[in-house]
UniProtKB/Swiss-Prot annotation:
Lineage: Eukaryota, Metazoa, Chordata, Craniata, Vertebrata
Name of the protein this chain belongs to: Hyaluronan synthase 2
Cystine crosslinks: none
Taxonomic source organism: Rattus norvegicus (Rat)
Cofactor dependency: Mg(2+)
Compartments, as annotated in UniProt: Cell membrane; Endoplasmic reticulum membrane; Vesicle; Golgi apparatus membrane
Length: 552
């Protein structure tokens, strides 16, 4: 016992020193600005900080590639499908078409004897359509529905403590005794909905799969995640490959689709290699039920800065698994399609909410670095502090008073984006990933200020995005973007003022003209490809129905 505690203390000290040293090293490299290569007049330079970031991308891509090779080898491993699985679907003001597609895909799941529990967040007349769709798709004679005035933590109007207890027991009994059930309950947020499913199931099943009501599951999705959990008893949770269902509906949903592929098949695949996936996404994830019930109460009652948390449910669920020392994995063999916002403002609000949960969970996650591979500490430091270094770099370049610095920054952003997207195109075997380089502009212009706004408002709760049946536009997300554009515009004006005081040399004019032409050509080529290959092909494809969720 004493030896274990001593080793634990050593690991805590070691990971802390490693993380602090890494951060100090990156900061020193950034401040010193040592250059390996630089041209006359500093038109181009490549320094220590840039070399570090380039190395990170290469190493991350390498481990992602190795993890994908391991996934392919696992196909040869036979397993017995004798473990019990329950699928929990969280629904809130869902678009009827998406919900119907979700439930139809659930009926096609190939895992034998899977139990389906759908919990609707809200029990008003306006929510009844979701229960009707459930009965229609799952079969009125094969499913059970129940309208609950309460939820496990709040009583409905006219309910007593005794009647609340009785109704809670009734809900639990309904879930345990039926293979397919839909419950409408008093509104309480997504975490309340998930808690109802977990609590009612108890320890009656081996694995619990989670799913959102806008998700289309691949028939083999459950089987593939069970394989991962069966192969290693120290894996506590696993997530699958989440792709975009409505990627051709707008430019924002299309760019989100290529970003999703990169996030799952590069970033999370790399994390999976070391057994420390930091977020098992809500549309497609599976957990060991025995672990789930070790922390479900603490997970539900999570507080931050004195307020109960009502977002970041999936990320905190993942962190709870990691806190117990169990690994979390990703498998590209399990797939699904899910809805993403098609309007810029709704997308911005979604990203702000996700950023809030990321930074909040970063602090919680840091307490368990010592229980996992050093890669978990390394990546947390890199991804957690990168936005701050990036903002400092942008402001510095925009206020140096040189037009070339601004142009070089724009060119560098697209060059890095092209390099990453080219590798992704090779790994995926699909040229469409080249459009990932366009997402870098969206990141710099919108996601970066949204992250800062998320930190400033991190204790503000709420769903963040509205239900899909009725889209509510929230303009609050434009505030940080407007402030950011004002800062950048100020830098451009300052630079023009400084440059206007002295004539351009012939070499400087040549460099600026060539750089501008390259940047303009990049946009002309990419936008032309988007219009020709995506818009036209998309109109034909987005109306198709898929029996299998394929990488299309």
């Amino acid at each position: 016992m004493h030896c274990e505690r001593f080793l634990c203390v050593l690991r805590i000290i070691g990971t802390t020193l490693f993380g602090v040293s890494l951060l100090l090293g990156i900061t020193a490299a950034y401040i010193v600005g040592y250059q390996f290569i630089q041209t006359d007049n500093y038109y181009f330079s490549f320094g220590l900080y840039g070399a570090f970031l380039a190395s990170h991308l290469i190493i991350q891509s390498l481990f992602a590639f190795l993890e994908h090779r391991k996934m392919k080898k696992s196909l040869e491993t036979p397993i017995k499908l004798n473990k019990t699985v329950a699928l929990c679907i969280a629904a809130y003001q869902e678009d009827p078409d998406y919900l119907r597609k979700c439930l139809q895909s659930v009926k096609r799941l190939t895992y034998p004897g899977i139990k389906v529990v759908m919990v609707i967040d809200g029990n008003s007349d306006d929510d009844l359509y979701m229960m009707d769709i459930f009965s229609e798709v799952m079969g009125r004679d094969k499913s059970v529905t129940y309208i609950w005035k309460n939820n496990f933590h709040e009583r409905g109007p006219g309910e007593t403590e005794e009647s609340h207890k009785e109704s809670s027991q009734h809900v639990t009994q309904l879930v345990l005794s039926n293979k397919s059930i839909c419950i409408m309950q008093k509104w309480g947020g997504k975490r309340e909905v998930m808690y109802t499913a977990f609590r009612a199931l108890g320890r009656s099943v081996d694995y619990v799969q989670v799913c959102d009501s806008d998700t289309m599951l691949d028939p083999a999705s459950s089987v593939e995640m069970v394989k991962v959990l069966e192969e290693d008893p120290m894996v506590g949770g696993v997530g699958g490959d989440v792709q975009i269902l409505n990627k051709y509906d707008s430019w924002i949903s299309f760019l989100s689709s290529v970003r999703y592929w990169m996030a799952f098949n590069i970033e999370r695949a790399c994390q999976s290699y070391f057994g420390c996936v930091q977020c098992i996404s809500g549309p497609l994830g599976m957990y060991r039920n025995s672990l789930l019930h070790e922390f479900v109460e603490d997970w539900y009652n999570q507080e931050f800065m004195g307020n109960q948390c009502s977002f970041g449910d999936d990320r905190h669920l993942t962190n709870r698994v990691l806190s117990l020392g169990y690994a979390t994995k990703y498998t590209a063999r399990s797939k699904c399609l899910t809805e993403t916002p098609i309007e810029y403002l709704r997308w911005l609000n979604q990203q702000t909410r996700w950023s809030k949960s990321y930074f909040r969970e970063w602090l919680y996650n840091a307490m368990w670095f010592h229980k996992h591979h050093l890669w978990m500490t390394y990546e947390a430091v890199i991804t957690g502090f990168f936005p701050f270094f990036l903002i400092a770099t942008v402001i510095q370049l925009f206020y140096r008073g040189k037009i070339w610095n601004i142009l070089l920054f724009l060119l560098t952003v697209q060059l890095v984006g092209l390099i990453k997207s080219s590798f992704a195109s090779c790994l995926r075997g699909n040229i469409v990933m080249v459009f990932m380089s366009l997402y870098s502009v969206l990141y710099m212009s919108s996601l970066l200020p949204a992250k800062m706004f998320a930190i400033a408002t991190i204790n503000k709760a709420g769903w963040g995005t509205s239900g899909r049946k009725t889209i509510v536009v929230n303009f609050i997300g434009l505030i940080p973007v407007s402030v950011w554009f004002t800062i950048l515009l100020g830098g451009v004006i300052f630079t023009i003022y400084k440059e206007s005081k002295k004539p351009f040399s012939e070499s400087k004019q040549t460099v600026l003209i060539v750089g501008t032409l390259i940047y303009a050509c990049y946009w002309v080529v990419l936008l032309t490809l988007y219009v020709v290959l995506i818009n036209k092909c998309g109109r034909r494809k987005k109306g198709q129905q898929y029996d299998m969720v394929l990488d299309v």
